[in-house]
């Protein structure tokens, strides 16, 4: 299996159906590349990334599982985030939440 690979039946399949998404402009203000994985709580990513962190609370990148987005130094790009599902509790990462959202 390949990271992010989906093995499905015939027909159309919508991922993250019914989940709220937002777009944010993100700038890497640091001097090193920053890579963010598919399921990382975006609110808690590397502090060198500049964006509206409050808006990103409870969201992750809306990309295939097992993949990542790389932000080069000085790069600005728009990303789509999708709302976290399940119990909507966040533990670990940078320890900024450590409980229910």
UniProtKB/Swiss-Prot annotation:
Pathway(s): Nitrogen metabolism; urea degradation; CO(2) and NH(3) from urea (urease route): step 1/1
GO biological process: urea catabolic process
Keyword Ligase: no
NCBIfam families: PRK13203.1 (NF009682), urease_beta (TIGR00192)
HAMAP family (UniProt xref): Urease_beta
Assembly information from the UniProt record: Heterotrimer of UreA (gamma), UreB (beta) and UreC (alpha) subunits. Three heterotrimers associate to form the active enzyme.
Protein name in UniProt: Urease subunit beta
Organism: Burkholderia thailandensis (strain ATCC 700388 / DSM 13276 / CCUG 48851 / CIP 106301 / E264)
Gene that encodes the chain: ureB
């Amino acid at each position: 299996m390949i990271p992010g690979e989906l093995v499905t039946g015939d027909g159309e399949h919508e991922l993250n159906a019914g989940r709220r998404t937002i777009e944010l402009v993100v700038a890497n203000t640091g001097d090193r590349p920053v890579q963010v994985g598919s399921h990382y709580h975006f609110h808690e990513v590397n502090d060198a990334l500049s964006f509206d962190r409050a808006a990103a609370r409870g969201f992750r990148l809306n990309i295939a599982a097992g993949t990542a987005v790389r932000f080069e130094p000085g790069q600005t790009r728009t990303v789509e985030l999708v709302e976290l599902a399940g119990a909507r509790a966040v533990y670990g990462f940078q320890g900024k939440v450590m409980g229910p959202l």
